[in-house]
């Protein structure tokens, strides 16, 4: 004992312990000495436990002396867990860490390193299989789930980890359901480690006998309780015997097993069927076997074991002697359990990754095959309950009514096992019969009968009020009872104004939920009755309120009800509600009040008025009023609740707002419906959704059950998260299906080129300002608030057309429209401008309706993608763009993968339903409904491709300027197009349009190239 020892402890891992220091530092612990220092090591550990307290688990003593280990740590007896190392792991250039982890708080474990790749950065840093990661970058991983640990490990490129060199990896294996039995002889709990019952193992040991029980139909009471059944995998056992009952007189004891009853075998029968057999006849012949125990509860437990790391890195299950021996058994400390009566029968479960062949043969063998041979030694494995404890039903066979099934009181603060032990330690109390709660009037009546001493009434059964009487008679104060008194209200002799309920349930001992509900209902009715009786100074009796009192109460509540009604209803509806309430107060009839109110209050928000109207209803009519109104109020509450948490509804576009843009992306919500994603959140949510899906994939893989209801352990590769997260940024671009034509509205979004910049520098400041203002308005699609550039007086003979004239409608100069790429519409508006505002609008509408602006084309696309992926704009309510057009196509959607749809196409029809002359909201709903209908595949879109009647774009004008409009050079609008356009217009207008087109092609150098060139109407020539 006097021999010295040294302590080798390296918390930061700064120094490695050499193999030559084995004399001072043990290979399996932080204490080092020779073989004679066992007592010293034991004393030091005991002193450390006294100073620091229980470090890995809390041991609590039960009332019967049983020791329970809480938190079930599986590394409780491991000496290597105190060796702490600091490891610094950096990601490789490819972004890999090179190790996998296992465990998590969802399994009651820490985070363990289960695999380390050869040549990886983790192996070079010194990370080993079997290390328990306790800290990462200053954050503790104790009591951390696997998902949180993986997110923390992949969040940084450099990991500073504190690990415990355990040298082993936790495995998991599952046992069958364990049944806890109550030993009647020794009054203790015995845990059975296999699914077979003691009667099955020792069927010949018990003494069998036949018992005859005779009862009558009037007084059917066998006097015992049964427990068990086929649904629990057990037989039928006697769990309780009434003191002095029929069963006790015939020798039936607690712990006897019922093998048969009247020829019906009970070895394979459910609990409810056994109750029916025992309560079916007056003469019952029971076959009884003495077992001395009955089942208490069942639970599913999981047993953890260790996988040891060999010298070559392969995991192998430890021997029984080296496994953890932390006791979590619920055996009593004095419960003898021989190996012959309770053999160990465990079930082998294969655990491992989803693809065992992806690793080497050693890994696949170690993770998927764990040999769990039954062992009869004194080995107690670490286990924890993974399912809630099932308390077996206990049914009393003693009455002709419904079977009274009782459970243990779940309100106790102790666990079910401790509650059972406390119940076993208490002395047995004889069975006493108690009647239901009686009213005060019935108690007085019963005392009068007892005082009268009538022999004929003493033996009769006194029945108390039933639940039906309490609900439908006790709650109505105006109905008289049998002797003429009011049943629900009575007067206190000491206080004439104090009204108290008849049902004084608090004095009757234990109060159940039904009695509490009845008491609460009576108190509520009493408070409402007092509110109606508050106008009176005092009353000698507790009668129902009169008509005058109801009128006074209505007049006091009328301003509040009318104020709330004006907020929710129209003026006519407010008058109607007031009229019906006044009629009810003066004439009565709750049905005549409820029916018109429900017809008026046809919206969920309007039904909120019923809460205030309920205060006007008389207490005698509240039951009928609630029965008629309550279902409607519940539906309204559900509707308001779903509306509060649901997506915001799309409202129709106003007349003074620009066209709306909506991303047609039907995404299912939690209620099975669909809603649209915002336009600006598609790219942001794409990465978030992929990241969430990645996390879900790992969590689902980690919790994929290999056994019913049991989550097994799996290795989670850390690099899979980092690689998946890095791959989410650039979405793959599919190859183009066909060469796409230039976008029709690219003039609005194309930046200025070098030639444009040079030209802007050479022009006058007024011209540059005019061009910049027109471009800014075209890009933002907003209405002009100041003066339009097209209305400025210019020395050139041709003014600049605005969106007001380009769309064929006449507006004042201060309300100019942004530019639209339509030369033909501008010419028609120019022609009609000479005939006045009214004729201008009519002629422009006729021209736009007659002239075809593009060819129709049918495009089909698949509905297999989750999102259609387009943004639309326009609608019949918009003056700028009455047609529905595709504003933008988003990558990844069905429209993008189709390859035929382009931004600027006009949508004519979707799946046979027309989109012409419809509102913006109607178009959104139509497209969403068509894409959601997966029965019609594929989706057919009829679009109008923009024709050649567009404005010359920037590139076209630049070509015209460079070539100086050579006479032999064909223009953007060829002769064929001019002839086609002119044949569709009236002859006078065609001639004017032809002159305008010919003059428009002669573009002077001083005119801005981005504006259409028209003939000046003020030119005298």
Curated annotation (Swiss-Prot):
Subcellular location: Cell projection, Cilium; Nucleus; Cell projection, Stereocilium
UniProtKB keywords: Cell projection, Cilium, Nucleus, Repeat
A GO MF term: identical protein binding
GO process terms (BP): auditory receptor cell development; auditory receptor cell stereocilium organization; detection of mechanical stimulus involved in sensory perception of sound; establishment of localization in cell; establishment of protein localization; inner ear receptor cell differentiation
Residue ranges, compositional bias (Basic residues): 772-794
Alphabetized PANTHER family for the sequence: PDZ DOMAIN CONTAINING WHIRLIN AND HARMONIN-RELATED, PDZ DOMAIN-CONTAINING PROTEIN 7
Extent of Polar residues compositional bias: 758-767
Region (Disordered): 324-345, 431-495, 724-814, 992-1021
SMART domains: PDZ (SM00228)
Quaternary structure (record): Homodimerizes (via PDZ2 domain). Component of USH2 complex, composed of ADGRV1, PDZD7, USH2A and WHRN. Interacts (via PDZ domains) with WHRN; the interaction is direct. Interacts with USH1G. Interacts with ADGRV1 (via the cytoplasmic region). Interacts with USH2A (via the cytoplasmic region). Interacts with MYO7A (via MyTH4-FERM domains).
Domain PDZ stretches: 86-156, 210-279, 858-930
Organism listed in the record: Mus musculus (Mouse)
Pfam family, one: PDZ
Tissue: Isoform 1 is expressed in developing and adult cochlea but not retina. Isoform 2 is expressed in developing and adult cochlea and retina. Isoform 3 is expressed in adult cochlea and retina. Isoform 4 is expressed in retina and developing cochlea but not adult cochlea. Isoform 5 is expressed in adult cochlea but not in developing cochlea or retina.
Effect of gene knockout: Mutant mice exhibit congenital profound deafness and normal vestibular function. They show disorganized stereocilia bundles with a reduction in mechanotransduction currents and sensitivity in cochlear outer cells. Knockout mice have normal vision function from rod and cone photoreceptors.
Gene3D superfamilies in the cross-refs: 1.20.1160.20, 2.30.42.10
Nucleus in keyword set: yes
GO cellular component: ciliary basal body; nucleoplasm; stereocilia ankle link; stereocilia ankle link complex; stereocilium; USH2 complex
Official protein name in the record: PDZ domain-containing protein 7
Keyword Nucleus attributed: yes
SUPFAM superfamilies, sorted: PDZ domain-like
Biased composition (Pro residues): 729-744
Gene that encodes it: Pdzd7
UniProt feature, compositional bias: Low complexity: 324-344, 799-808
Primary role: In cochlear developing hair cells, essential in organizing the USH2 complex at stereocilia ankle links. Blocks inhibition of adenylate cyclase activity mediated by ADGRV1.
PROSITE patterns hit by this protein: PDZ
């Amino acid at each position: 004992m006097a021999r010295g020892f040294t302590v080798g402890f390296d918390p930061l891992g700064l120094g490695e312990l050499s193999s030559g220091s084995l004399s001072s530092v043990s290979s399996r612990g932080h204490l080092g000495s020779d073989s004679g220092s066992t007592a010293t090591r034991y004393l030091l550990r005991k002193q450390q436990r006294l100073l620091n307290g229980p470090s890995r688990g809390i041991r609590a003593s039960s009332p019967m002396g049983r020791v329970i280990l809480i938190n079930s740590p599986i590394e409780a007896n491991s000496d290597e867990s105190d060796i702490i190392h600091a490891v610094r792991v950096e990601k490789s250039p490819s972004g890999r860490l090179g190790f996998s982890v296992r465990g998590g708080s969802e399994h009651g474990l820490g985070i363990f390193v289960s695999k380390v790749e050869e040549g990886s950065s983790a192996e070079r840093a010194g990370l080993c299989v079997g290390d328990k990661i306790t800290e990462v970058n200053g954050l503790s991983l104790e009591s951390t789930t696997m998902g949180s640990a993986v997110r923390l490990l992949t969040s940084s490129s450099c990991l500073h980890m504190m690990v415990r060199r355990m040298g082993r990896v936790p495995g998991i294996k599952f046992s069958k359901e364990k049944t806890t039995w109550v030993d009647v002889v020794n009054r203790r709990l015995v845990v059975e480690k296999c699914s077979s019952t003691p009667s099955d193992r020792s069927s010949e040991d018990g003494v069998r006998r036949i018992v005859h029980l005779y009862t009558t139909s009037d007084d059917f009471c066998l006097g015992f309780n049964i427990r068990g059944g086929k649904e629990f995998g057990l037989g039928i056992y006697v769990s309780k015997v009434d003191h002095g009952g029929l069963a006790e007189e015939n020798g039936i004891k607690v712990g006897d097993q019922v093998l048969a009853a009247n020829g019906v075998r009970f070895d394979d029968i459910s609990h409810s069927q056994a109750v029916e057999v025992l309560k079916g006849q007056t003469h019952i012949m029971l076959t009884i076997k003495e077992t001395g125990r009955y089942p208490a509860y069942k639970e599913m437990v999981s047993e953890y074991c260790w996988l040891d790391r060999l010298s070559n890195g392969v995991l192998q299950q430890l021997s029984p002697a080296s496994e953890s021996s932390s006791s979590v058994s619920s055996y009593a400390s004095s419960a003898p359990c021989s190996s012959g009566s309770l053999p160990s029968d465990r079930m082998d479960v294969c655990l491992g990754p989803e693809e065992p062949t992806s690793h080497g043969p050693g890994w696949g063998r170690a993770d998927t095959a764990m040999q769990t041979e039954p062992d009869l030694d004194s080995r107690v494995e670490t286990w924890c309950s993974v399912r809630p404890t099932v308390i077996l039903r206990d049914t009393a066979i003693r009455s002709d009514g419904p079977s009274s099934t009782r459970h243990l009181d779940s309100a106790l603060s102790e666990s079910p096992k401790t509650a059972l032990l406390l119940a076993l330690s208490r002395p047995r109390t004889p069975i006493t019969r108690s009647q239901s709660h009686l009213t005060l009037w019935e108690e007085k009546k019963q005392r009068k009968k007892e005082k009268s001493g009538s022999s004929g009434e003493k033996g009769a059964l006194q029945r108390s009020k039933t639940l039906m009487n309490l609900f439908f008679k006790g709650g109505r104060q105006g109905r008289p009872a049998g002797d003429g008194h009011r049943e629900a209200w009575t007067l206190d002799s000491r206080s004439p104004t104090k009204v108290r309920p008849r049902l004084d349930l608090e004095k009757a001992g234990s109060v159940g939920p039904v009695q509490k509900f009845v008491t609460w209902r009576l108190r509520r009715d009493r408070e409402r009755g007092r509110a109606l009786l508050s106008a009176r100074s005092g009353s000698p009796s507790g009668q129902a309120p009169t008509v005058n009192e109801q009128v006074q109460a209505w007049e006091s509540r009328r301003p509040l009800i009318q104020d709330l009604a004006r907020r929710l209803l129209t003026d006519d509806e407010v008058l109607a509600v007031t009229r019906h309430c006044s009629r009810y107060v003066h004439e009565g009839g709750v049905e005549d009040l409820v029916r018109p109110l429900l017809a008026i209050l046809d919206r969920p928000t309007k039904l909120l008025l019923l809460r205030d109207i309920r205060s006007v209803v008389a207490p005698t009519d509240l039951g009928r009023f609630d029965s008629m109104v309550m279902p409607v109020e519940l539906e309204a509450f559900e509707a308001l609740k779903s509306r509060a948490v649901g997506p915001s509804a799309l409202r129709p576009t106003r007349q003074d707002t620009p066209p709306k843009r909506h991303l047609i992306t039907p995404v299912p919500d939690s209620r099975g419906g669909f809603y649209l994603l915002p336009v600006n959140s598609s790219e942001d949510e794409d990465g978030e959704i992929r990241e969430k899906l990645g996390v879900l994939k790992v969590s689902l893989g980690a919790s994929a059950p290999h056994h019913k209801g049991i989550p097994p352990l799996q290795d989670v590769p850390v690099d899979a998260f980092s690689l998946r997260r890095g791959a989410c940024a650039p979405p793959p671009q599919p190859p183009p299906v066909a060469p796409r034509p230039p976008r029709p509205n690219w003039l609005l979004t194309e930046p200025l080129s070098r030639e444009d910049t040079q030209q802007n520098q050479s022009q006058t400041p007024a011209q540059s300002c005019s061009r910049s203002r027109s471009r800014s308005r075209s890009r933002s699609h907003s209405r002009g608030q100041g003066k339009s550039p097209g209305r400025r007086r210019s020395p050139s003979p041709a003014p600049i057309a605005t969106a007001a004239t380009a769309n064929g409608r006449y507006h004042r100069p201060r309300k100019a429209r942004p530019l639209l790429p339509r030369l033909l519409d501008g010419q028609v508006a120019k022609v009609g401008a000479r005939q006045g505002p009214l004729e201008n609008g009519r002629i422009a509408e006729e021209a736009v309706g007659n002239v075809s602006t593009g060819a129709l084309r049918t495009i089909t696309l698949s509905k297999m993608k989750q999102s259609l992926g387009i943004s639309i704009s326009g609608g019949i309510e918009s003056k700028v763009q009455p047609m529905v057009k595709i504003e933008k196509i988003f990558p990844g959607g069905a429209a993008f993968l189709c390859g035929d749809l382009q931004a600027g196409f006009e949508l004519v029809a979707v799946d046979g339903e027309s989109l012409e002359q419809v509102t913006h909201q109607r178009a959104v709903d139509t497209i969403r409904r068509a894409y959601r209908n997966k029965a019609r595949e594929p989706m057919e879109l009829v679009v109008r491709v923009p024709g050649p009647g567009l404005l010359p774009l920037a590139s076209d004008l630049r070509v015209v300027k460079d070539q100086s409009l050579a006479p032999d050079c064909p223009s953007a609008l060829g002769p064929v197009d001019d002839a086609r356009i002119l044949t569709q217009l009236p002859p006078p207008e065609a001639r004017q349009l032809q002159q305008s087109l010919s003059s428009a092609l002669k573009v002077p150098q001083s005119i801005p190239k981005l504006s259409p060139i028209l003939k000046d109407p003020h030119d005298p020539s």
